[in-house]
């Protein structure tokens, strides 16, 4: 095991900082990757798709066919094939997706017109030349909802044995909806994702092919995608992979052929309104990447901001975790009110901005860094987003906050007025990585809603995001402040190297953290992952009384929450003396008593704010020389100044 760890660590180090002797090899590999070719193969390539599809914008219809070459890489025979038909989750209000969406307080979709819903209908399917169209059926492995049609099972004439392969031919039609879950159309803007019948993942215990849920995303195997898309002539198109061929057809259409190896999904977009920009990422120790931006014309002045944020991601994630291997990436600026912003797919992602995007505010930078970062956490490390979404969303939220802090601090609070159209930047309120970057406020609200070890698809729909994104970012940042960034960085890069183009599970990460840190951190993961208990430490009481020539001081600290973490207690005296106590945090309370020639002034639990998961930092300190009056005066004056500025600004518009 130790030799394996050393080998993995060495490989991770090599991935982050390759030697100059490998320059020629990197150059050759980079040229191939820019054509969508990955040599040698990076993944098992056991689910390969050749797809042909045509979009009719007038009817919002996609007509498609696909050939899937699938190989059974498990040790169990496959008696059936199971497919995701995601768009049936938006077919009506009775699907599991829509039922859960209603629970989360989403839009009232009953007001949608009939043509604003979606569907995907498989019209024919053959397996190894045998017509299986009449045998297909919908199954509901998660909730037995008889109205859900998002998983299709096709029984096989003969099981596919371990190591065996099969060719599957599928034909289907689909109706493009008014946007659901960042997929769909508005006007002539189309963003098309999860749009084809896609195989689930066969594992040793059977098919992992969950129904489509409102609070979860996706899971699939890696392979080669060769996709030909026919759209109206003159409409720019962006997609996963590299465009290998473009052919003008009769009837005013153009067919674009895109190709990419070693990815687990394929998404695309087209619109006559896109402005196309290109740029390049270069780095002395990382492979170059061609960047292509599909931009709304009203955002033309923000092109470089999108490119710069993408460069930030490729640089810092590449240095911290491992190189981005594909030689290209497509950035999509979605149409106004499309609802398609902030989503990730292999080698392509959607960002999101506004016409008025002032400097000092991370719009579009924040969402661009986050979605580009998903190329690493989700794209290359392919965790199961149905069950363990925190392994990409949480890792990526932590990484986003760290990368943004490297480049874009200070960034400021901004509020929007007049329906979100006019921004107002409060340049005396800088946002911090530790709180706003890690989304502490959202976690506080939902901290007890679910244990993180609960499969993601079983989280309560309206609170799952706080557990998936926010809690993970906070406990990772806590580990950084506690163990040190060098240790956590080695753990994350080792995990990345060990599990890229594979499907890790939560314990795989915990094992690597223990190995790299040299500690058994099971107690920590038991609390942050397997429990919904919360952390909350504070100072309950602080006293100082004169006793002759001395002062007798007492400090009572308390664990208000159920979760346990070691914390420091800083006690400060009027003489300037500072005493730091190290408390294991296990007892409900602890008393510290002192005899000193000067009185105690204040006490503070966790003065360096290591425990970012602490729900209530306002109770962490007490002072015997309160500054409440001056604080109230300061805040009152500040708010009055803001109010005056706002009134003057609005008056100027009158």
Specify the residue positions occupied by each region the protein language model found.
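Bacterial N-terminal signal peptides
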Residues: 6-14
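N-terminal, polar/Ser/Thr-rich
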Residues: 20-63, 186, 521-523, 527-528
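Solvent-exposed beta-strand/loop surfaces of large extracellular or lumenal domains
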Residues: 34-42, 91-155, 179-183, 242-251, ...
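Hydrophobic alpha-helical and helix-loop surface patches within well-folded domains
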Residues: 46, 85, 89, 258, ...
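Ligand-binding face of N-terminal immunoglobulin V-set domains in extracellular IgSF glycoproteins
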Residues: 61-89, 93-95, 105-106
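Short acidic/polar inter-strand loop motif in beta-rich domains
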Residues: 90, 174-181, 607-619
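Extended, low-hydrophobicity, Ser/Thr/Pro/Gly-biased non-transmembrane segments
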Residues: 104-124, 128, 150-157, 167-274
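Beta-strand-rich binding/interaction modules
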Residues: 238-239, 522, 535-538, 542-608
């Amino acid at each position: 095991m130790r030799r394996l760890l050393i080998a993995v660590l060495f490989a991770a180090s090599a991935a982050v900082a390759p030697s100059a002797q490998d320059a020629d090899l990197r150059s050759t590999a980079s040229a191939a990757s820019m054509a969508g070719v990955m040599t040698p193969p990076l993944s098992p390539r056991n689910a390969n798709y050749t797809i042909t599809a045509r979009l009719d914008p007038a009817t919002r219809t996609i007509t498609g066919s696909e050939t899937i070459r699938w190989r059974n890489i498990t040790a169990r025979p496959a008696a059936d094939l199971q497919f995701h038909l995601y768009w049936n989750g938006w077919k009506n209000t009775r699907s599991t997706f829509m039922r859960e969406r209603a629970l989360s307080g989403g839009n009232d979709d009953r007001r949608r017109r009939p043509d604003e819903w979606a569907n995907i209908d498989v019209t024919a399917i053959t397996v190894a030349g045998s017509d299986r169209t009449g045998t297909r059926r919908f199954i509901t492995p998660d909730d037995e909802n008889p109205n859900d049609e998002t998983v299709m099972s096709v029984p096989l004439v003969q099981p596919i044995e371990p190591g065996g392969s099969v060719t599957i031919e599928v034909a289907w039609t689909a109706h493009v909806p008014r946007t659901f879950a960042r997929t769909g159309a508005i006007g002539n803007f189309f963003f098309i994702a999860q749009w084809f019948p896609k195989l689930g993942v066969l594992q040793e215990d059977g098919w992992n092919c969950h129904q489509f849920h409102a609070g979860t995303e996706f899971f699939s195997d890696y392979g080669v995608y060769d996709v030909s898309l026919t759209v109206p002539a003159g409409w720019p198109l962006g997609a996963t992979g590299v465009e290998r061929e473009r052919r003008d057809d009769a009837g005013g259409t153009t067919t674009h052929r895109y190709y990419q190896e070693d990815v687990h999904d394929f998404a695309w977009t087209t619109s006559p309104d896109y402005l196309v920009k290109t740029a390049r990422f270069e780095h002395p120790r990382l492979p170059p990447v061609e960047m292509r931006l599909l931009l709304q014309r009203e955002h033309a002045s923000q092109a470089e901001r999108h490119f710069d944020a993408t460069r930030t991601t490729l640089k810092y994630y590449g240095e911290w975790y491992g190189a981005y291997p594909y030689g290209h990436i497509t950035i999509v600026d979605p149409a106004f009110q499309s609802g398609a912003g902030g989503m990730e797919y292999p080698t392509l992602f959607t960002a999101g901005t506004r016409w008025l995007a002032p400097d000092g505010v991370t719009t579009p930078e924040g969402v661009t860094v986050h979605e580009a970062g998903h190329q690493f956490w989700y794209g290359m490390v392919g965790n199961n987003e149905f069950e363990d979404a925190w392994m990409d969303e949480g890792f990526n939220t932590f990484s986003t906050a760290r990368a943004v802090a490297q480049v874009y601090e200070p960034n400021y609070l901004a509020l929007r007025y007049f329906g979100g159209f006019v921004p107002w930047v409060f340049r005396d309120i800088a946002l911090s990585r530790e709180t706003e970057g890690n989304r502490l406020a959202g976690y506080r609200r939902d901290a007890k809603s679910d244990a993180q070890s609960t499969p993601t698809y079983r989280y309560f729909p309206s609170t799952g995001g706080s557990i998936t994104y926010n809690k993970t970012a906070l406990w990772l940042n806590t580990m950084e402040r506690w163990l040190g960034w060098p240790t956590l960085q080695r753990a994350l890069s080792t995990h990345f190297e060990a599990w890229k183009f594979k499907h890790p599970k939560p314990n795989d990460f915990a094992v690597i953290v223990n190995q790299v840190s040299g500690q058994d951190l099971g107690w920590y993961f038991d609390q942050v992952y397997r429990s919904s208990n919360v952390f909350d430490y504070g100072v309950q009481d602080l006293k100082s009384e004169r006793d002759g020539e001395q002062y007798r001081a007492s400090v009572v600290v308390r664990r208000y929450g159920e979760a346990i973490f070691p914390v420091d207690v800083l006690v400060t005296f009027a003489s300037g003396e500072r005493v730091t106590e190290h408390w294991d945090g296990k007892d409900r309370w602890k008393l510290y008593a002192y005899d000193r020639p000067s009185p105690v002034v204040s006490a503070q639990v966790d003065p360096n704010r290591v425990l970012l998961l602490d729900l209530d930092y306002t109770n962490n300190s007490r002072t015997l020389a309160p500054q409440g009056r001056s604080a109230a005066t300061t805040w009152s004056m500040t708010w009055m100044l803001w109010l005056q500025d706002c009134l003057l600004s609005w008056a100027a518009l009158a």
